[in-house]
A protein has these predicted regions:
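Domain-level signal for Mg2+-assisted phosphodiester chemistry and nucleotide/NA-binding surfaces
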Residues: 1-98, 138, 147
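Nuclease catalytic cores that cleave nucleic-acid phosphodiester bonds
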Residues: 60-172
């Protein structure tokens, strides 16, 4: 009897983007349950990589959370938040743009996987997703309505709304 090999899966979580999506939805997901669910959901898969990207106020910020992510098997990438002035709103906001780090990790590890789950709604990933798909990589994007760029949704093989998987991944 011939069995099909398991898909090789990599998960990329744009932590800041997902924080706002979860805040909008009024519930938060559990990073451990995310791994467990998507390993089973995206065809039966072997998890080869899981990356989590987040901005920090200072080097000690979110230390406990970051340590927990690492113990679950995530590779955590961080950047210190920078303050920006928004001329339109007249307010300062903080941002740590980790898009380049996400794309670099996607392409640096591309030979290791054939399926990707990207947790982000950022349209800046459109071209990277198109290029990965041209190499026969299956891409699933997870975000929430009203926070996913049309370009990203159109570029992906599959879109999953966070609310549709809430019962599987919500933090207890």
């Amino acid at each position: 009897m011939h069995t099909q090999p398991l898909s090789r899966l990599s998960i990329f979580v744009d932590g800041n983007n997902m924080f706002y999506a979860q805040q909008k939805n009024g519930w938060f997901f559990d990073p451990k349950r995310v791994l467990e669910y998507f390993i089973k959901e995206i065809v039966p898969s072997t998890l080869v990589n899981a990356f989590w990207y987040t901005g920090l106020k200072d080097p000690q910020d979110q230390r406990g959370f970051r340590d927990a992510l690492i113990s679950l098997g995530y590779t955590v990438r961080t950047k210190i938040l920078k303050e920006y002035y928004d001329d339109n709103s007249g307010r300062y906001s903080q941002k740590a743009n980790l898009d380049i780090e996400i794309v670099v990790d996607m392409f640096n590890t591309a030979a290791q996987y054939d399926r990707v789950v990207l947790f982000s709604g950022d349209g800046d990933f459109e071209r990277a997703i198109e290029l990965l798909r041209s190499k026969n990589t299956h891409i699933t994007v997870v975000s929430t309505e009203g926070m996913i760029a049309r370009e990203l949704r159109n570029a992906t093989d599959r879109y999953i709304d966070l609310n549709s998987v809430r019962k599987y991944i919500e933090k207890d």
